[in-house]
Amino acid sequence: MPTPHNNAAKGDFAKTVLMPGDPLRAKFIAETFLTEPKLVNNVRGVQGYTGTYKGVPVSVMASGMGIPSIGIYSYELYTQYDVENIIRVGSAGAMRADLELGSVVAGQGACTNSSFADQYELGGAYAPICDFDLLMAAVESARELGVKMPVGNLYSSDTFYDAAGRNMRYAKMGVMAVEMEAAGLYCTAAYTGKRALAICSISDNLITGEELSADDRQTTFTNMMKIGLEAAVKMAQD
């Protein structure tokens, strides 16, 4: 059932979708890791693919940048395409000096400066968290792959350029890294009764000033991708 943002047919998406922000990263994941990937969506250049990984159907589709964008795509996948699990595989800026470029973190929770959750009229501050089963599948996968993956709080910012200098205030509260989508994804999963997890690779470090190139961000975050794919396999076995 196509939507204004997705021209895939019902049944074109697997139960688990890996969701990078970048359409080129979605293409890279599909062509590098999936067997017989099929392009199922290309509206607005937001490419979506479905194939298999180790015999398990898996889809990958870009979310675009920011909470409003991932809010649209995740909601439609959950409600129109019967997707059960969305694993965000994106980049993040480290708020700890010990997080090296290319290292992987998982967001157990995601605080935000966004008003996205206001739509639910909860009357308070909602704390978006990931799905525990998805998180454990990712943690086990990371251990099996020999990849160190700290688990903690992410900060989903509505702004990329931090004009007011507020990002580092979150670092003082133990937040590991800043990105722009996880909180919206977690809220949408909670509202629809589905599962979500954000796994992020460190593209730059706000403490040290180090950063990766745009090309490296598209194609070198393979540990994050493998963890997401292995987690998808584990979820299919449960």
Where are these regions (language model features)?
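His/Asp/Glu-rich mid-to-C-terminal helical/loop segments that flank catalytic regions of hydrolases
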Residues: 206-238
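Generic non-transmembrane alpha-helical segments
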Residues: 137-145, 188, 227-235
